[in-house]
Amino acid sequence: MKRSRVKVGFGALAVAIGIASVICLHETHGVREAPNASPGPSPEPTLAGGQPDVGEDAPNRPFRVPSGDPARLSCDAARHIVSQVREQLAYTPGPVDAKAFGSAVADWLDPYGLWSVAPDAMTAKSFERGASALLADIEGRGSADCAAAQALGTAVMPWISELRKVFDEARIAGALDDDAWSEATAPVFEGESVTRPAHELAATLGRRLASVVAEYRDAAPYVDVATARYFPSWTSDDWAGVVLASAVRAYVPLLDPHGAWAPLDEESSVYEVDIEAHPPLRLWDTCERTAVGVVIESGAAAPLADGDVVLSLAGVATAGMSLEQIDQLEIAAAEDRLSVDAVVLRGASGLVAVSLHPNRGDTSIASDNAQGPGDLPVDAIAFGESDALVVTISDVRDDLGDELTHGLLRTREHSERPIAGIVLDLRGNGGGSTDGAIDALGLFLPGVPLFPMRRRDGSIETDRAPEPPVVDRWRGPVAALVDANTASAAEMIAGALASYRRGPVVGERTFGKGCAQEHLDDDERAGVLRLTTLLYALPDGKPVQRVGLNPTLRLAFEEPGPHEREADLIHAAPTWRGPDVRDRRVLARIDDGTWAGSWPAHGGHVGPCRDAQVCKALRLLGAPASRARRFVPPKGR
């Protein structure tokens, strides 16, 4: 079966990611070793995690330490969350396809390839047959007590019992011929495509855990936790709750292609775009799930070491955790302000207890990936008798305005030639923060009204660009370079420049994501939502959603853009044309040349450029016959 959990956020292109992958990848940051860290007795593994209060602003609270258990929802809770999603979505929701829903529920239910997605899973047909009834139940159109979830939960129980017998027989048969260390560190779960029969996986788990216990007696408690997670002895009510949580998780992205819901134990997965833009502290770089825990492949922060099998972290056993919970556990542990205990399996040393001090005033643990102000790549490229500054902006972060300000000021201060103009290279930029886009635009359009944004109730909000100090502003020529992968907040930047006739857009038609997402606590305080709550238009009212930006100067790139665009996504928000909110006084000053100058002629002298496409764009901007030489597109809409 193909696993395709869709995870997209504001500014991320809507692509299916095989989230069931056994590899976890991220940045690593240093951790100080505890002075007295030494081998010692292992703490008792636990299946319970902390229960911090849920704040109103979900991103500003620490991630909770996950429990290792899957989320459960009651029938009423599932319905309340679904109702909240349907009511707060920026547009009238369409019908969810029952077949796709059933497949997605089975996928979210099974983090191992054992319970419902394996090719021999006897539960697969149950999910196909029961999908329509389950969908009706969570939408409030079905039975009063969500009987479909109860039926599916009951159907899973005998299958788990059958697999447990296979597991027990393999474990009793004894250890594998391979050494126990190899068995403890060997990856065991498949990635995007699950092709291995569940019976085979159950037997493999049994033999590998038998090998580990035979060699490392102290690991027995962790093996017991692993066994309980792989083959849980839950009641039908327990299973029904897990099915309902999986149903909500499957439902939201099928209704909103940029949306998601995650339980509090896995909420970091809802913020993956934010985490990528602002990397948190980390304890390792890459890892893989094994039968008994998580093996660190690379980038371990001391006192952890590459090759360690992490059996527990912050008192929680790692075996049998979903990838989402492992990721959140590592972030939560690294964010701890005091110390965190871990137990690792370390080759001939056996079980080793270590104490981590992730954030005790040590500046060396600062994010390796975090950019400081002015870290945006800025290239000065010959443009006639002057230089054109080309700024590569790969994503739109909250602090893009500061980054752009510092980067341009630094380059301008050290430039030995006049600056002909600035090109914002937004190719491949999937977007990010609306605040970041608005702040960046303040450098070129200070104080102007920008994007009208409409909510479901018809109310319209309009933000203004900030008014940075005069020394930070750029009144000279500017342009945006875009391609088919330019989306969302990046389209905002390019589109605003064009709407105000401030500068041309060069390249090809953009992705067309004219909607924005917000993070919300669900009404049940059971998890976090990422939901499309706003549709936006350009300052002149032109739509972006499903349409994209048509460049002022077309430039065919050698590598074609993706075939899929926002308009191709199922249940993508509709196109919305907004009011014209432009400041007419600013338009008049731009048109008469008092606000900013036009791109000068380059006389054929451009480059050299590291990227040939950039030189092509610059030649278009300064060509005598180009509209960009005196950029005045048709007025109005």
Task: Label each PLM-derived region with a short phrase.
Residues G18, V22-G259, P579-R637:
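Terminal targeting/pro-maturation regions of precursor/exported proteins
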Residues R5, L25-P35, P45-L89, K99-G102, ...:
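C-terminal "post-core" interaction segments
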Residues Y230-S236, E266-V270, V423-G432:
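Conserved short loop/turn motifs at secondary-structure junctions
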Residues R249-S298, G374-A380:
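PDZ/PDZ-like peptide-tail recognition elements
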Residues L255-D256, D274-L281, C287-V292, L304, ...:
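Short flexible coil/turn linkers enriched for glycine and charged/polar residues
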Residues A301-L329, I422-R427:
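Conserved PDZ fold ligand-binding element
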